């Protein structure tokens, strides 16, 4: 999914807007999602609408063998210093890259910490439908962040990510170091990757 707005980040940004249409474009040196390599390089783009905590949007990325096309909607808000959100995300693919994933997204944040949980189902073309739970703990301060995340139920694997993001000349840039275990690797070995991302968001009046 999105390089900048993922999970709770998208939900919480929705909670701060009144009414806003926006478009975004981006590029990643390696497109990883939840510790799993999707494409060795990937351009992307999306559209979002946010209003009084509610959000809806779509996002697409090149995944080498076709396109990943995501759709999502939900609601986020704040109570004092605590942020919360609930939403739905569907991941759809052209070509033969993968099958459909659909999930409910839950999130909560306080201070520098956020917790994300996704409860989903995978339409496995090669076998029975699979259920999964994704969980993540992220600590972020002044653009620097660390994340520990993994899967349970029919999926398995864990990863750790360290990174930094900033806005430079009106561009959102990021650098991340990813450590993923062998369960998330297509080669069956543990994986370490340095990932560079760049993107820009445009307000649509």
Positions of PLM-derived features:
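Outer-membrane beta-barrel proteins
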Residues: 2-7, 11, 15-205
């Amino acid at each position: 999914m999105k390089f900048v707005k993922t999970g709770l980040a998208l939900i919480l940004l929705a909670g701060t807007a009144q009414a806003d249409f926006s478009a975004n474009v981006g590029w990643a040196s390696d497109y990883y999602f939840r510790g799993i390599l999707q494409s060795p390089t990937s351009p992307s783009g999306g559209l979002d609408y946010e209003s009084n905590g509610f959000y809806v949007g779509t996002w697409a990325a090149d995944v080498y063998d076709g396109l990943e096309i995501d759709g999502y909607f939900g609601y986020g808000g704040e109570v004092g210093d605590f942020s919360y959100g609930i939403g739905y995300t569907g991941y759809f693919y052209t070509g033969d890259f993968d099958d459909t994933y659909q999930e409910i997204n839950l999130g909560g944040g306080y201070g520098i910490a956020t917790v994300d949980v996704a409860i989903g189902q995978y339409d496995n073309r090669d076998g029975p439908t699979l259920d999964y739970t994704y969980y993540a703990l992220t600590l972020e301060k002044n653009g620097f962040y660390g994340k520990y995340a993994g899967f349970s139920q029919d999926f398995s694997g864990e990863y750790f990510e360290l990174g930094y993001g900033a806005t430079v000349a009106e561009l959102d840039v990021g650098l991340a170091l990813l450590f993923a275990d062998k369960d998330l690797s297509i080669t069956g070995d543990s994986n370490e990757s340095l990932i560079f991302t760049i993107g820009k968001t445009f307000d649509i009046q």
